Amino acid sequence: MNFENLYAAALALMSIGAAGALAAGKRPALSQVIGCAGLISGIIVSAISVCAGLPDYVNLFRIPILILGLAGVWFSPQYLKGHGSQRSGIYYFFFNLTVAAMLGVTIMNRPIPFLVMWEIMGLASFALVAFDYKSRQVARAAWIYLLACQAGGMVLLGMFLMASSVEAFFILAVIGFGLKIGFPLLHVWLPEAHPAAPAPVSALMSGAMIQLGFYGIWRWGINAVASYSEMFGFTLIALGIICCLGGIILSFPRTNIKTLLAYSSIENMGIISLGCGLGLLGLGKGNVTMIFCGFAGAGLHMLNHALLKGGLFLLAGSVQKATGSLEMEKMGGLLKRMPVSGSLFLLNSAGLSGLPPFNAFVSEFLIYLAGFAAFTVPGKPLFMVAGVAVPVVLALTGGLAAAAFCKVGGAVFLGEPRSKEAAEAVEVPLSMRLPVLLLFLCGCAVTVLTPAAARLFAPEEWIQELYPAIRALQMVAVTSLAVTGLFVLLVLIKGLLPRGKEIRRSCTWDCGFSKPDARMEYTGSAFIQPLVFFCGRLTGAKRKITHPQGSFPEKSSFEEESADPGMEFFWEKSFKFFFRLAAKLNFLQSGYLHFYILIMTAALVLMLVWGFLLPWAGTLMKGGF
């Protein structure tokens, strides 16, 4: 079977659906049907190719694209009602185009087609981020995202042009693909773009698109640096540690649900980076356990993150649909009003924190094993340091993530409503709940099927050496399944037990207050305040306190705002420098056509000189693309 033809057919179906949705834009219902039909048919054809083909690491990137594309297009019709449904033709055009381009990125095997698909993916998703373009905040977020996409594309072009230098190639790969992943200082677009984009788009971008940065590193970077694998392995581990701790710490003071989830995505990209780094160290040393557990743990965590984080972003959209807001301090008590969505949010949050028996624990367990294997490598002190640092960071990150998600769960779903909108919220339609349930059930299936998949992907000659790791993985999967089954059984038994007497329901004990008010309960910010105070300026939080004065003080206040330290201390200063530089170059805009032609001619001459007089550049330009 020719799988390339199947993928080409899938891209064609998605593109036809996109064009049809745009053409029928004046009839929103028709454009919705055409767009959904084109995307779903393309996903089905792609899924046939994935299932019928041989086991391939690329499928770890294709499966999230297909699953989240399906969940997103399933979720979108009800979500768009009252949220831009009259522009559904434009929405489905760019949504289909984004999914098709993401799939195309995983198909293209040569630099130029790969870069073309990469650019289409960035531009199409930019249009989706800017869907509510009339909002000043959305417009700002969209332009920041577009700048990041274009900067990443330029760096990747330079990466391919510098293919003769291994060091430069990998460094540019880390920067170019790191802009998509959200590596330190390259992450600033994530907390801006995700809150601005529609919820299905945020789910697709966070769950599948940013992980394509790792596909780029795996596809183009790792093969090129086999002889330098130790050095670059430590580089990825260092970046992973900063992402893990920095991402989750920066999430603490955030009050917007999707902003917090965006920082959580940075943390999870750090976990994947740790696995990739340990795998590279294993390549340099020839350690089979490190290679397999590192790369397998990273790949499996990509899939788990896609399922869990995609579900959480969709649930954030459900909350926004029900309350009209994403500010968690305006919510409260939604678990009573949205029991299915609230329960799924809490379950996905526990899973993403890496707690057993959920699926993310299984992938992190593999990375733990890779770290323990690094500690036992003889004669390598730095390997021992990595073997200690990685498990410690993973454990610490899991605890901090649990605290961050406790903040969200408590502020949004527990307690009493803090606004009229939260008090009047109702459960979202079934078509918005089923996609999230599908993602969660897929995550449960991943937990059970991981040991079998591990044996399938492991080379035959490695099976004997990997037997202890695979055996431990089987025990984790069986234990997780048993605990989950026991929990479900207890819930069913509780529901079936006869009740001897009627349960009296009354208000919560008010501790002596005659009229308790929602203002008296802890907010999410108050809950997480000890950790924010402990982490200090790392969280980006700034406080302004007006202390009471005099014997009869009239007023006092406490204000806290948070800014991303990377944006505040690096990018804003960098932008100011370039603005000043651009102002000094205004003289080039003389308004004379012949002067512009002279500049273009000079640039063309310089490109020709660079391309034909430099031997390595000429060779690359003639045969490398």
Describe these PLM feature segments.
Residues 1-6, 54-61, 110-112, 226-235, ...:
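Interfacial loop-to-helix junctions that mark the boundaries of transmembrane helices
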Residues 18-22, 71-74, 248, 408, ...:
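Alpha-helical transmembrane segments
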Residues 1-93, 506-508:
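Transmembrane helix-loop-helix hairpins at membrane boundaries of multipass inner-membrane proteins
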Residues 351-366, 440-458, 537-542:
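Alpha-helical transmembrane segments and their membrane-interface junctions
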Residues 453-479, 495-625:
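Aromatic-capped, Gly/Pro-kinked transmembrane alpha-helices
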Residues 71-83, 89, 96-114, 124-428:
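Hydrophobic transmembrane alpha-helices and their helix-loop junctions in integral membrane proteins
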Residues 240, 341, 348, 432-447, ...:
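Hydrophobic membrane-spanning alpha-helices of multi-pass integral membrane proteins
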